[in-house]
Curated annotation (Swiss-Prot):
PROSITE patterns recorded: RIBOSOMAL_L27
Name under which the protein is recorded: Large ribosomal subunit protein bL27
Stretch list, region Disordered: 1-20
SUPFAM superfamilies linked to this entry: Ribosomal L27 protein-like
Organism of origin: Enterobacter sp. (strain 638)
Pfam family name, one: Ribosomal_L27
HAMAP family xrefs: Ribosomal_bL27 (MF_00539)
Biological processes, Gene Ontology terms: translation
Keywords from the UniProt entry: Ribonucleoprotein, Ribosomal protein
Gene Ontology molecular-function annotations: structural constituent of ribosome
Keyword Secreted recorded: no
Family: Belongs to the bacterial ribosomal protein bL27 family.
Length: 85
């Protein structure tokens, strides 16, 4: 009869669930107020005109309009604004 000695246990084999971060509405897309534009950790993108920032740094539309991405300021920060149509 074949015998195999018991293998040891392992401390690997688990991983966290993906958080589905990233841009949800791209430049030029029409959005309604309340639409999530970006889910992010920290402020990779900053809130511009008609855009709010949630407590987890999620950016969302405060008004209906088109999404506009812009880079401005001395630090070349990325801002997201909503331009009314």
């Amino acid at each position: 009869m074949a015998h195999k000695k018991a293998g040891g246990s392992t401390r690997n084999g688990r991983d966290s669930e993906a958080k589905r971060l990233g841009v949800k509405r791209f430049g030029g897309e029409t959005v309604l107020a309340g639409s999530i534009i970006v889910r992010q950790r920290g402020t990779k993108f900053h809130a511009g005109n008609n855009v709010g920032c949630g407590r987890d740094h999620t950016l969302f539309a405060k008004a209906d309009g088109k999404v506009k991405f812009e880079v401005k300021g001395p630090n070349n920060r990325k801002y997201i604004s909503i331009v009314a149509e």
